[in-house]
Amino acid sequence: MSQHTSQYVFNSKEDYNVILDNMSREFEERWNHQTQSPYTNLENYITRAVLGNGSFGTVMLVREKSGKNYYAAKMMSKEDLVRLKQVAHVHNEKHVLNAARFPFLIYLVDSTKCFDYLYLILPLVNGGELFSYHRRVRKFNEKHARFYAAQVALALEYMHKMHLMYRDLKPENILLDQRGYIKITDFGFTKRVDGRTSTLCGTPEYLAPEIVQLRPYNKSVDWWAFGILVYEFVAGRSPFAIHNRDVILMYSKICICDYKMPSYFTSQLRSLVESLMQVDTSKRLGNSNDGSSDVKSHPWFQGVDWFGILNQEVTAPYQPTISGAEDLSNFENFEFKDRYKSRINRHPELFANF
Ligand SMILES: Nc1ncnc2c1ncn2[C@@H]1O[C@H](COP(=O)(O)OP(=O)(O)OP(=O)(O)O)[C@@H](O)[C@H]1O
């Protein structure tokens, strides 16, 4: 499996369209070529530390035994996945991670399983979550926000071109690498669909009105969430954040787009947020045939060196301090709890294709 996110150099708009077509062909090949993980547990790796705990598993720092490379191993209990009805999501996540290759997306390096757990081996991204960094500084200035937003817009453009709806955009799912560039992670809710779907999923603060109203929706829900994300970067809070997080009240505000624009937003940022957060999807920026180009050519992005960003030549506004692969200073301290150790293979039929 290739360990490179991109072997491409991005030079011009024409080249980029050709490159995206090539990426699309390569994506299709990998999408159609899924392999079953061997029952090798983590025997090819040495576990060094816990990087984080998600709702469905633990992410550990591991080092491969045959070399010196470090990775993040996402370990998920089969029992928990069945109990929490996440079986389809985990297959989905592996499928997408295996097929997608883009500079700002996490990808699958390897996968294994054992009687109790499934393991996804991912590139180690050790600058911590964008969420934690944002919480520390509270607000980004617009230039700083634009640096991250440009990468998210390019990643959404790629995913949509591959007919993937991401459906879980939020700062918690954006990791920072050593150079301060982003890697989007967590593809459990990502769905490959060319058109519309109607499953209710995502995180309340970022749900588009059509999802809240249980209406069929398309990839423009990601552009709505992108509007929320950019707003939150600069305002330091989500537009629909409500004291005590009354979700029903939040949903009623989302449906009528009832939020306040901070007075310090520039007119270009106001215009971007307003255009993305349109209840009427026919008016929502990003929802035309040439959707991502419309977003990228919005005046707020004027002056962005798109190819410099794609090639990661632009200096990031913040570079995490990392002294080595085992430096965990950008992560909170987590404890490891290995709850299951059975002699029987749990749910072999449900995870046969994992
Ligand atoms: N590739 C990685 N490199 C470094 N740390 C990672 C990596 N992937 C995940 N982590 C850390 O582990 C945490 C949990 O990972 P992840 O969000 O994938 O789990 P999850 O169970 O899907 O979580 P969620 O609760 O968001 O559904 C992340 O927030 C991050 O801090």
UniProtKB/Swiss-Prot annotation:
Q: Indicate the segments forming the AGC-kinase C-terminal domain, all copies.
A: 302-354
Q: In which tissues is it expressed?
A: More abundant in adult body than adult head.
Which top EC class is named for this enzyme in its record? Answer: transferase
Q: Which GO terms describe its molecular function?
A: ATP binding; cAMP-dependent protein kinase activity; protein kinase A regulatory subunit binding; protein serine kinase activity; protein serine/threonine kinase activity
Q: Which GO terms describe its cellular component?
A: cAMP-dependent protein kinase complex; cytosol; nucleotide-activated protein kinase complex; nucleus
Q: What is its EC number?
A: 2.7.11.1
Which pairs of positions does the record mark as disulfide bonds? none
Domain of life of the organism encoding this protein: Eukaryota
A GO BP term here is: signal transduction
> Which keywords label this protein?
ATP-binding, Kinase, Nucleotide-binding, Serine/threonine-protein kinase, Transferase
- Which positions does UniProt annotate for ATP binding? L51, G52, N53, G54, S55, F56, G57, T58, V59, K74
Q: Cross-referenced SMART domains, in alphabetical order?
A: S_TK_X (SM00133), S_TKc (SM00220)
PROSITE patterns registered for this protein in UniProt: AGC_KINASE_CTER, PROTEIN_KINASE_ATP, PROTEIN_KINASE_DOM, PROTEIN_KINASE_ST
> Protein name, please?
cAMP-dependent protein kinase catalytic subunit 2
Name of encoding gene: Pka-C2
